[in-house]
Amino acid sequence: MKIALDAMGGDHGPAPCIEGAVQAAKELDVDVVLVGDETTLKQECARLGATDPRISIRHAPQVVEMHESPAAVARKKRDSSIWIATELVKSGEAGAVVSPGNTGASMVSAFFVLGLTKGVERPAIATSLPTLTGEAIMLDVGANVDCTAKHLEQFGLMGNEYGKHLFRKPNPRVGLLSIGEEDSKGNEVTKEAFKLLKASQLNFIGNVEGRDVYSGTADVVVCDGFIGNVALKISEGVADTIKKLLLKEISGSWLGRLAYPLIAGPLLNLKRRIDYAEFGGAPLLGVNGITMICHGRSSAKAIKNAIRRAKGMAEGRVHELIQRDIEESLATPPAEPSA
């Protein structure tokens, strides 16, 4: 398996990408193509001692910066690292593309180069969240700020297939994020989406509230990209604040400092559970190929784990299974409303 890595788009330059690629090649038995400015990448590889023969370089003279409009990619940056990396997936040279760069640029490249899965109206970014029972998927978390009920239904179908792959569960529990558990709670879009999801073949458990997302009540949580992105950013902020408060309390008293050796292990485990680097990246579901989107500040560990997930999805042909489910849903007549 070969993975195309946009090595130029991250906040910290190509170094974390190169280090993550080396770790992935060593631990995951995967070939990685570093896509970016050839001279820069060769210099960085030499500086970091990255000589693994499974790491190769594909020249891309342009870079999409974080502040640039994603629309500019299709108009004037088709020689950018993210565009060329995505083309490697389209041609079949790579099984997936991973990028810590401009999220919008990744989406635009996937849309124009790979194309939407047949029948999919909108793609969705699916992130992984830690729960009391393990892990859950939430989608969409930023690809679409405005959604229809049909879009949310399709997010449920796509998330269900990703959940089958990720959790090795034949029938993941799918919930709809809302302001109450009752069927009648929510706005008009979510109430209509509730009806569509309930009539589908999914293991739909109904509405889930924000407080239930991390309890493990649902394996897949469906929402629009505006709500999902806000919820994700709040969660990241809360996790970071709790971590800082804990350290402040521990270091602020002699009793805390005395007890630290006894609680260091559990604290380290907690940090690992909520660390985004453990999950690596979030796939863009609903396109004809595997696109993995990472944090701009991704570490080498995060890049390695994003490659791990991208490799697994490519080997599992998750995008093809999503297409099958979408086609089946479109071929199935809507259920008659109950009396």
Describe the role of every protein-language-model region.
Residues 6, 35-36, 58, 99-101, ...:
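Short beta-strand segments
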Residues 13-17, 78-92, 96-110, 121-126, ...:
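Short glycine/serine/threonine-rich phosphate/pyrophosphate-binding segments
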Residues 15-66:
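N-terminal glycine-rich anion-binding loop in soluble enzyme alpha/beta folds
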Residues 15-16, 28-33, 39-42, 145-210, ...:
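Glycine-rich phosphate/diphosphate-binding loop of Rossmann-like nucleotide-binding domains
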Residues 50-94:
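Phosphate/nucleotide-donor binding subsite
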Residues 111-125, 130-138, 217-221, 225-337:
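Glycine-rich phosphate/nucleotide-binding loop
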